[in-house]
Amino acid sequence: MTTTDCLQQYRDSVLEIEFFISEAHIKDASGNFIHPEKFRDFVISSAVVRFSIAWETFLENIYCAFILGEKDTQGGVVPCCVSVSNLDQAHKLLIGTNKYFDWINPDLVVQLSALFLNPDNPIKTAINSTKSDVLDLKTIRNAAAHMSSTTQQKLDSVASRLYGHQAINSKVSEVVSFVRSDGKTQWEYLRDLLDVATENIAKGVV
């Protein structure tokens, strides 16, 4: 998969997610939601999980592309410290002796780049600039996937910081729909932030 393909696949996934969100929030002629709140909340939670998966998939794919020597979207080559002959080997190299790699963990992603890429590399640069927001996405994703006392507490912590006051029993749909001071919802903010990050990584921007 080329770096252009990696970026396009990510963006196609996000567009599909936004379509589902839009469909869930259709209103009738009177301005009332067609679907009940419980349905809309379900779609939002599912969308957050899918969004996280799209981001993680992009990171794994772009790592493999760099390791295989694929050119970035600007025509350059991201220097790599290892060499593999095929995609399967690239995936195995990234996973190592683990059963899987935690692509939503920004610290681990940066550590991985230090093993296989030059010290200054596009993945490290992009991840370091988005770390706190990716951690927020991880918190929201975990709550969307499985609400427990632990995930609820962490979601409330994110919500409290966003709202500027203590939040209790926050809902995923409420957090991602929160309108920030810049006029964007939290969903729009994360969507735009990671779109820039994925584009810069694919471009090889250090």
Where are the regions that the model predicts?
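Long, hydrophobic, amphipathic alpha-helical segments used as structural scaffolds
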Residues: W55-E70, A145-L155, T198-V206
